[in-house]
Amino acid sequence: IKISENPAKVTTPHFKKVYRLFSNTDGKAFADLITVHDEVVDENKPLELFDPDATWKRNVFTDFTAKELLVPIFQGGKLVYKQPSMEEIRAYCKEQIDLQWDEVKRFENPHNYYVDLSQKLWDLKQELLKKQR
């Protein structure tokens, strides 16, 4: 773990998964969630998210879809990734931008887009920080 006086610069070590969370009501992305690699987000259960820098700020979400964002490039030393064309990359980027709320995309006073840690990953990070004191 890299420790810094600036909390934003403290690393979050571990093998991780990243999920993008979408509201089933309107299809918009409302947060990204970083988990330990062996965690699974159960879309059938309420999901509590919290701000890793202000842990008292918590919200419970239901009726959502979680999409895993990271894709394997190599497995067992073999390349398993087919690189998309520039047009496919452009289309994907446009699609992801369109899935954001207008309030997040605006230039003046944009709303924050939340990237949260799972409770398990946050606990592991805190444990490592305590060991370094």
Which sequence ranges carry the predicted segments?
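Gly/Ser/Thr/Ala-enriched C-terminal appendages of enzymes
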Residues: I1-R133
